[in-house]
Each structure stands twice: as C-alpha cells, then as structure tokens.
C-alpha cells in the first residue's frame, strides 16, 4: 500500500462505466502504472488473492492530456505505443488532481530511468496527443499518410506517430505551418514549402467537432507562443532603428518574378523611412478560422509567400501578428541590368535580328551603315539572340498592287498594263509568270518599239506546255506610237515588243528559214485601225517562244506532251483544184502563219497576193470569163478575210 499514489472512482471514456482506479508509483513491486478494478471491494480482495482487471504502464505512455468532448467535459487521456486509456472525472477539480498525480509518477519514472541499467524512456513527453484518422486527401494521398495516427504536439514540432511505432512517421515544424482549422469533426493543417512533406494540406478526422475545435485552439496557442518567441530574433540589432518595408498583401494585376521582388525589397530596406506606420497585429482567430472553400481560395491568392531562411510560418507569423514594424507601400520593381556578356539573354523585341547566323558585311550590299554596326556588335556577342523582325523593314503585311508603286525585290507585278520590267529573278529554277518577264532594267534598257527583231514561227515551239493567256490588244496594254509597226514588210520578219523577251520560252519565236513570215491571229475581237498604216499584232501565237532573259538563259526541258493543240483544218488541196477556184474564208494556224487554203492550192507561196494571183489566173487554162472569175475570187477573199487581217503585214489583192 506504500506505493499507491492516488485511488478513486473514474468512468471509462467509451463505456462510461465506473471503475476503481489505483495509481502506483515505481518501486520494488513494479514500474509506475495505473490499475483499475471493477469496484473497491474487488480491489481489497485482489490485494491478497488476485490481480487488477486492467493495467496501463505509465513508463510507455508518451502523452497525458486533459480533454473534453460533446458528452464528457472532464477527460484525462493517456496514450501509449499500443493504445491508450481515457477516463472521465466528476468535476474539474478531480480532473486536475488526477492529472497532477499522473505527471508526478511519470517524473519519478524518468528519474529512475536515468540510471545506466534502467530501460530507455520512449522519448520526450508531448504537450498534447490526439488520436486521428488521416484522410486520403492532399498530402495524405500524395505522401501515403492515410490511416490511424497519433498527432503529437511538442514544444516546436507537430508529429504523426503510427500505432506500435517508436518514432514518428512525419515531424512537422510549427514554423512551417501556414494555417490550421477545423470543420465539423475534421481538422486540417496547411504546411509550406519548407516542410518535409512539401506544400499541401493534411486532413484528419476525430471523434467529434469538440475535439477538432480543441485541437485547433491548442495548436494555435502553440504557434502563437512560438511566434512571440521568434519576434525579437527577426529584427537584427543593426537594423533596429530602420523599419522593414513590407509590400502590400493585395492582389497585383501582373505579379513580378521572385527575383525582382527580392531586389526591390532590398532597395527599399536600405532607405530609411521616418514616421512609418506600424500595422496592427491581427487576431489568431481571424486568420486561422475555418472558412468556406471560396474564402479559402481568396485567402490563398491574397497571401504573399516570402523566401526567408527561417521558415514559411516564421515569415507568415511576422506578417500576421506584427512582429516587426513595416511600411505598406506599392512595390517598385526594378529589373536587373546585366552586362553584355554576363547572362544568356534572349531579346524578344519587335525589331531585332532573326538568327545567330549572319552573312559578312561585305556581301550585303544593301545593308545601311547603322545596320552594319549592329551586325558587327552582334558578332562579338556569343550568347545573344534577337528574336524580332529585321529593323530596316517595317512592313505591316501590306503588299502594294498598283503598277506605279515601289516594289521590293520579291514583288511580282500582276497587272498586264505595267511596262516597267520587274527586278531580276534571284531564285534558281524560278519561272516568272508575269507577262512582263524578269528583264532587269540595269542589264537591258527597253524601248518602244523594240530594236531587236524576232521572227515568228519556231521549230521547237512545241517544247513547252505553257500557253500565253495575255492579249496584246490596245485595250489591255499601253499603246505604242502608231507610226511604228510590229510586223515588217513582205520581205522582213515580224516585230514583237521588247517586253516579250522577258517572257518564258513559250513566248519567244525563232526566225523561219523561209523568206516570208506571217503572224497568226487568235483574238476573238479584231479591231479596225486607220487604213494605210501598219498595225501591231492583236495577239500572240499559241505556239511557244524561246526564253532569252531569264538568269543564265535557262531552257526548260521538252514538255511531256500535256498540251493539246486545237486548230481549224482546211479541205484537201485536191478538192480545191477540182472544184471552184474560190478561196475559202478559213484561216489555219500553222507555225504562226495564217494561210488561205485555196490560195495555197493555186500558188505555192501561200499568200493571197494580187500580182501572184493574177499571174496564176493568166496561167489558168480557159476562156476569158474564167480568168475574170479568178480575179473576182481574189476580191472576195479580200472582203471575206477582212482588211484588218490582210493589212497586218500580208499583201492582199489590190
């Protein structure tokens, strides 16, 4: 009986049945323990005959705490590695007596265990211990911490200890706790980046909302006491007279990067500010109270995380509880200005160079002096890259399509009335589709009418599959001087404009071996001009022309034969000789010459000439009436084919 410290009736927490509890001190009869019997009578009988109904070894207990829940207001909870025990007293005074007695017995047990042969004590005593069920949410899921744990609150730490485990599974510093709260029977803790688990939340379920509220209040008190302890340490003695400027914790439209925030914060701290207001400390219940999900998201966005070596909570507690004076002002962000070779800087400006690979300055004839200096400076910078556009070029994506506007080198004129030839083609293998071709004004000066004469009819005119669709009528081209003609006299070749020389090969015509050449007409509308004057051709022959002005006089290979020639064919010559001597009013396209088939039959030169026709009529056998019919036939041919056609370089019947 000498080892009994205290005895009396208490109720068990779960069953709420009264039991007779006996608190024994460590000694020769056993270690410090808490025994309970069914009643006092059984205890007296068991003193000599039997043992207690239950025993709790206090040397294995790592927490003894006062609690209260919805049903029992005066609880004592003792936690061990394997389990625990909770008892309820009748009043607060009785609760305090048992609590103090258990702590004294534990202190005696620690004193005895300090001897070398004594067993090791399970570790430092915790201020508070709660049995919780960590839910698979947040860090409980990502760190695989779900299950039954003991949440142990020490002086500076908060640990999670599994059942039948000697060491805590996770130990969180109170300085790393950003906030905590409870909702119904759930209690959550949010930690920052400095925690061993990383940033996130831990959600724990307890018996009821009263226990959750008790956990909330107890941990907040520990955090508050810890923040008060850290308060004098956050201010250095050298800066005691200089208040620390704290930026406003409001939302910024464009938050700067962390590096710029740090630079601006140091620059403000170096400047002394007088009469700076000191923010009032905020209450703990306001910042760490339970909020709705919408309010929590707003609170998360409004908080500013500071990168201090102490911890996330240390910095947050300084801001929350006003541990250091500060000035609430709008931060001024000053980005650093590194040297030319200090960092690998990539400029994203609008006007800059496009790539690191640049041509030598000597090869760029069109580069201005300012740009040349920029290129020279750029070659000295190894790690510098400009991602913008070229500086001299300030186009907005607009391409002028008018004939008289200034054109760049890669501009292609699309108007048939443009007489000035474009710039020379610089890309190999490129075929200009413009009717004005690619003749360079620097290489060849064009005049109207041209000095070069090109004959119609080409032997290799069928080597190209290109068809000219541009009409040379007066309504679609600039009108040359009327006194000049494109087609020569009967003995000379046909003249073509000098702009034709810039066309692809399919527009050039080589001279025919025959002495006389004729130009065909494929225009749908034949216009009349002043009689007695030479006339320019109304269209170009469908047959191809030779290329002469493309770079390198490039000749395209023969066409595989996609082109299909559609032309009018005249009746056989035998039918014409046997039948009437009248020349049919048909024109056949052949090598760029228009022939009257009947006249071709009467005379071999293929021309409906008056003197030749008259000679053939004289040589014709028959009476004078037949010769008159032959002469009449020539006049009808003249009227049928039209004066425009017979006047375009062909000798008509006169």
UniProtKB/Swiss-Prot annotation:
Residues 228-329, 473-494, 507-532 are annotated as: Disordered. This is Insulin receptor substrate 1. A motif (YXXM motif 5) lies at residues 430-433. One of its GO terms (molecular function) is SH2 domain binding. Interacts with the NPXY motif of tyrosine-phosphorylated igf1r and insr via the PTB domain. Binds to phosphatidylinositol 3-kinase p85 subunit via the phosphorylated YXXM motifs. The keyword Phosphoprotein applies. A motif (YXXM motif 4) lies at residues 411-414. A motif (YXXM motif 3) lies at residues 398-401. Residues 235-245, 307-321 have a biased composition (Polar residues). CDD domains: PH_IRS, PTB_IRS. May mediate the control of various cellular processes by insulin. When phosphorylated by the insulin receptor binds specifically to various cellular proteins containing SH2 domains such as phosphatidylinositol 3-kinase p85 subunit or grb2. Activates phosphatidylinositol 3-kinase when bound to the regulatory p85 subunit. InterPro entries: IRS, IRS_PTB, PH-like_dom_sf, PH_domain. A motif (YXXM motif 6) lies at residues 466-469. It comes from Xenopus tropicalis. A motif (YXXM motif 2) lies at residues 384-387.
